[in-house]
Each structure stands twice: as structure tokens, then as C-alpha cells.
Amino acid sequence: ILGMLAAVKNRPAATLSGPPPKPGQPAMTYFMSFKRGMETLPQACADYIGKESIRLGASVRAVEPRGKEWSVFLTSGEELTADHVILGTAAYDSANMIKGFNANLATQMSAIQWSSSATVTVAFKREDVKVPLRGFGFIVPKVENRRINASTYSSIKWSYRAPDDSLLLRAFVGGGHHEELVHDLDDAALTAAVLEEMDTILGLKSAPAFSKVYRWFKG
């Protein structure tokens, strides 16, 4: 990291910022996402494939090779036939599906460690955050033993995420640090814990105008 910082420090300023944007053009950013969120991608895939070909709420028990094809066994007892199978599931779920025909690979996949995590998104008026927000967020060193791992200034990374007079902040909880918070606290308690930490770091003058918790258990 120190070497990277030294390289950036010694680099000419022009190469850091690049050419200035043309009049009427937004400044260049290294952060990109869909304006309507990540669901834009699966929705586009569904539109392309045809929603009549998509099975929602169907759990797969196992997949097995059958010559040049594959059999997909659902927990409902139904069996589907496919030319190809792509597993986009967590390693522990994929291991259960393939253990019938490749026990060695299933064992290796089962050994991959997973942890639960959550994000807590909160919105404030700009004047209700005391500390000037520079950059796009911060990472909390594990040695500080705080209940959040990091925070992203979502509305600064992506200006369209909040009105000009507001801030949208997202905190990360769990993973390999204080994972129990994701399991043990309800949404209200988890949000309160995050706000306590953010108040210490950023200085909050009021309660958030909006909050939302998302959890990923073992994923």
C-alpha cells in the first residue's frame, strides 16, 4: 500500500486527474452502477430469456449428468432436462447438488468458509452530518473493534442516489467481524448500533430520515 501511495504522490498531477471534462459533461468517475440498482441486470436477462422460461421459488435438490444432457432434480419431485447447467449458488449449496456424481469436488466446495453480513443504509440532510465528507467512504480497522466494518457515501459516489441537500450513507456489518450482530439483532437494533458508530465517527445531529437493512446469511 505504501508503495502505491508513493507512486501516486510522485505521479504528475495531470495524469492523476486526466483532462478536464468538456463543458456540460460530468466529471469522470471510477464508480459505475445501474441507476435503478443491481436488479437491472437480472431483469434485463429475464426480459431477454423470456419470463415464461423462468422458474421462481423452485429449489434444486441435485444435478446429475445423463450422457450429453443433465438432469435437474427439484425438491418438489420434478425432474428437468437441460443441455447445460450453470450453478450460480453459494458453494455450500452447490456442493449438495453435485455430491451425487462428484463427491471430491463437493467436499472441496463444502470447505469454503462463508460468513453472514448486512448493510444498513441511512439518509440524512447534509447539515445533519457534522464532519465534512471527503472521498467516497471509509474503512474501519479491525483493531478498533467497532460494530461496523466500513461505510460508503453512496450519494457522493453516485450523485443521483439522493437530492442535492441530502446524503445517503451505507454501513457494512458482519462478515469476519462481529458476525453475531447480523443474526442476533432485529432491524431496529442493528440500525441503532450502526448509528451509534457513525455518530462517533461522523457526528450526527438528528435521526435518519430513512433507513433500510439488507442481510445475507452465509453469503
Regions from the language model: what does each represent?
Residues 1-12, 148-162, 219:
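Phosphate-binding glycine-rich loops and adjacent basic patches that engage nucleotide phosphates
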Residues 1-63, 69:
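Active-site/ligand-binding neighborhood in enzyme catalytic cores
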Residues 13-16, 121, 206:
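Residue-level signal for secondary-structure boundary elements
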Residues 37, 189-190:
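Soluble or luminal CAZymes and related metallo-dependent hydrolases
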Residues 49-52, 76, 205-206:
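Short glycine/proline-enriched coil/turn segments at helix->beta-strand junctions
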Residues 56-169, 175-184, 188, 196-201:
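Mid-domain catalytic core of redox enzymes
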Residues 176-178, 191-219:
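Flavin (FAD/FMN) cofactor-binding core of flavoprotein oxidoreductases
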